[in-house]
Swiss-Prot record:
GO terms for molecular function: metal ion binding; transferase activity. This is FAD:protein FMN transferase. It holds the Pfam family ApbE. The keyword Membrane applies.
Length: 341
């Protein structure tokens, strides 16, 4: 998620290292930095000589490139240029951005259009977009006008001779990809590490984690899912991952209070912040992008529908529902395989 929901990563201690030196054989190395309004962290258990200074530069270059594609906060990003271009003609996009949008459209369709990447205007009027946070609740008229600029049926992803295009039929429609950004970036960092021949690592960007374990290493990565509270870092459950991605979305951290609690996840159907009984959703899959898309879509659906779709789609999901002060947890059969008893 673009809005940070921290996943506690056991033994992920951020230490100072001299990354300009070539590291010794079998050394564990930590790299970290900032991107997309959150932190990124990479832990590598390496069994060959590698210059980590160069690797960190590659990671930072990729993250900068991703930000220049998808960030609504970057006025010159590809998606910002699409939003500013008030035309209904097809606009060229690259293959990576097309893949990101295709996942958004797919999961959007499967979640009854609740995951809606065209909700940029709605997100802005509620103060969670690149514009300044507002200190007043938008009027019903403002919400209605924003909804008129929203809808997955108003965009098309086109392919012509291996060239990708994105088209909107409402000139002022605004795309916001913040719900998918961390997963998108994490998958791209995975590709970099794989290309470098690194086969034992994990990557963390905000609330999304990607793990890879060497065939020679029988130990899986142990990940702790946080209990959904506003302040405490208490562990809710532990999962064991080998070559997987996990993403968590929640309603308990990114919000502001104005007469009532205003959460960052906006329901495009009502035009208001989501009124959901779910406080946390965690999804495990092979793709960080897919996990990142599904966790937000499911939280918008609410417990009953999220459970139904998780079963239908055979998703590895942990749903945490709150009733007053009591938390109720449901895990799908696929998720149970990763749980540490």
């Amino acid at each position: 998620m673009a809005y940070v929901i921290n996943i506690c990563i056991l033994y992920f201690l951020i230490i100072s290292i001299q990354i300009n030196k070539v590291q010794k054989k079998y050394e564990t190395v930590f790299l970290c930095g900032y991107t997309m309004g959150t932190t990124w962290k990479v832990k590598i258990i390496n069994n060959r000589h590698l210059t980590y200074y160069n690797l960190k530069k590659k990671i930072e270059k990729q993250l900068c490139y991703d930000n220049n594609q998808i960030s609504s906060w970057n006025k010159n990003s590809d998606i910002s240029n699409f939003n500013k271009n008030f035309t209904t003609k097809p606009q060229k996009i690259n293959k990576n951005l097309a893949k990101l949008i295709s996942i958004g459209l797919l999961v959007g369709k499967k979640t009854n259009n609740l995951l809606d990447i065209t909700s940029g205007t709605l997100i802005n009027i509620w103060g969670f977009g690149p514009t300044s946070r507002k200190h007043s609740i938008p009027s019903k008229k403002t919400i209605k006008l924003a909804q008129m600029l929203t809808g997955l049926n108003h965009i098309k992803l086109l392919i012509n001779k291996q060239q990708y295009y994105l088209q909107k039929d409402i000139p002022k429609l605004q795309i916001n990809l913040s719900t998918l950004g961390e997963g998108f970036a994490a998958d791209n960092l995975k590709r970099i590490l794989d290309d470098e021949g690194i086969n034992d690592y994990y990557i963390s960007i905000g609330g999304t984690v990607v793990t890879h374990t060497s065939p020679k290493n029988s130990q899986n990565k142990i990940i702790a899912i946080q209990k959904p509270t506003e302040t405490d870092n208490e562990i809710h459950c532990l999962i064991s991952l080998k070559n997987n991605a996990v993403s968590t979305s929640g309603t308990y951290r990114n919000y502001y209070t104005l007469h009532k609690k205003i959460i960052h996840i906006i329901n495009p159907i009502t035009g208001n912040p989501a009124n959901t009984d779910l406080v946390s959703v965690t999804v495990i899959s092979k793709s960080a992008l897919k996990s990142d898309a599904w966790d937000t879509g499911l939280i918008l659906l609410g417990f009953r529908q999220a459970k139904k779709i998780s079963i239908q789609e055979k998703l590895a999901v942990c749903l945490i529902k709150k009733n007053k002060s009591t938390l109720f947890t449901w895990t799908s059969p696929q998720f149970k395989k990763f749980l540490i008893k």
